[in-house]
Amino acid sequence: MTWTILILVVGILLFLFGGMLLPKTDNKKPSAGNIVMGKCINLIAIILIAGSVCRLYMPYYLTAVNPLIVQEMVNGMQEQQQAEKNKQIRKYVRSEGKQMMRDAPVLGNRDAKKTIYVWTDFSCPYCRRVHGELERVLADRDDTRVVIKNFSIHGPLSDAPAKAVIAANLQDKEKAAELTNMLMTREFYSSKDLQDQSTLADKVEANVMKMAKEVGLDTDKLKEDMNGEVVARELRNVRDLAQRFEISGTPFLIIGEQAFPGAIPADQIESALDEAE
């Protein structure tokens, strides 16, 4: 701002007194060279004044006269960034989709042509909401499957459920899906459990094991697999992909060639599926 004002002052002074910079001649009539130089000085002064006025007026124009233009510019930049992000995600999913599914639990028809990848956390309320929307979609479509990428970001509230469903997938894929639905629709810790952080992880795991037993899983084998390499590999894959795709929170959905951060309704999921190849 200071430099802009200084340039404006210089431009005004140059316009008013620029003639004093011209070389003096003995003739009363100005020479052709002085006339040209005078016009050049005036032109430079006008450019400096016009540029400075524009720079000083632009913030006022953007914020007071036409504030919507700023929002339009921001929205345009965000749309452009999202389009580029979607392009990178699409390219990766097309080449590495099978690898992304290798150790992950799957809901719906495992052989379906259309795939939804969802980064989710069992203790995230928005993830629970979008899970319900996904269940509504799957109930009406046999051409869609949902690949669960367990992005454990809430520590002891998330670790045991995430590991359990991945480990359950090694035992029985259908029961793994059933356990996923159960963990998303029922509480596996209480407000009382939260009062003692030192025992919270153990209490959460104990409750998860009760649910696993309820769906018919071998809980001894489940505990062993939860600490095995396959589970560790899948959790690494989830974190690595989150970093690659710049996923900072849950839920996050990839549907066809589009990415959706946050919980979205069933009709929006349906629309994205209809647009997907």
Model-derived segments and spans:
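Cysteine-centric redox/oxidoreductase cores and disulfide-bonded domains
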Residues: I153-T250, I254-E277
